[in-house]
């Protein structure tokens, strides 16, 4: 059973993640651009794929930043990385720059999954006769989810090094769209360094990190960090 604090804050995180981190308006704008792109022949699409990749990269950077912010709130700490990057809103008077470990962020965003990076998958679909806008949207949503949760892991790792005793709990969306393998993990708490293990033999440090890509696509789960 989730505590009131876990339920309320997780609800906020889920709401932000599903309705704010990638807003419907943002996805609608991207979908319109993608539809225009995929109306072109593959040879012409190759000329504009870099623009879309840059736009997707901006989205993933924000996912990493949001994950850092939420993880700090979960643990009641402020992991202050040595590097900082400029992002939207940092020119506003009185607003501090977002601070993240840029090396960690780049490593997470550029992670190879099933032998390819997200960039390579986007390029493949743009070069394919069978590519569709939905294929790219699926990449954006899946990668955003992975980057967000991996960002939370990065803060958890740093906190565990500093104080020890960091644990993580797996939470699902508690609806009929949740996979049975993920429902199996609902509420499970493990030490930060351990993996979550499903009944089908797969495992992950966090949602979006399973060995089987089919366990990652369209996943909406999240982790909650605590110190004990």
Annotate each language-model stretch with its function:
Residues 134-228:
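Acidic, glycine-rich two-metal-ion catalytic cores of nucleic acid-processing enzymes
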Residues 1-147, 151-155, 159, 163, ...:
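N-terminal leader/targeting and assembly helices and adjacent pre-domain segments
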């Amino acid at each position: 059973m989730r505590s009131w604090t876990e339920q309320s804050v997780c609800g906020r995180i889920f709401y932000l993640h599903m309705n704010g981190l990638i807003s419907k308006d943002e996805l609608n704008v991207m979908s319109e651009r993608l539809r225009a792109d995929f109306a072109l022949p593959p040879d012409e699409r190759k000329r504009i794929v870099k623009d879309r990749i840059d736009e997707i990269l901006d989205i993933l950077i924000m996912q990493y930043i949001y994950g850092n912010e939420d993880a700090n709130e979960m643990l009641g700490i402020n992991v202050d990385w040595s590097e900082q990057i400029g992002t939207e809103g940092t020119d506003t008077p009185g607003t501090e720059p977002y601070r993240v470990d840029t090396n960690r962020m780049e490593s997470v965003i550029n992670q190879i999954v099933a032998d390819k990076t997200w960039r390579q998958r986007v390029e493949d679909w743009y070069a394919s006769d069978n590519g569709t806008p939905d294929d790219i949207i699926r990449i954006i949503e899946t990668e955003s989810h992975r980057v967000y949760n991996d960002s939370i892991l990065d803060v958890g790792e740093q906190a565990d090094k500093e104080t020890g005793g960091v644990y993580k709990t797996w939470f699902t969306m508690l609806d009929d769209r949740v996979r049975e393998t993920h429902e199996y993990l609902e509420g499970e708490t493990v030490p930060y360094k351990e993996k979550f293990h499903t009944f089908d033999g797969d495992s992950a440090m966090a949602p979006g990190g399973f060995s089987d890509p089919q366990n990652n696509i369209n996943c909406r789960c999240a982790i909650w960090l605590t110190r004990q």
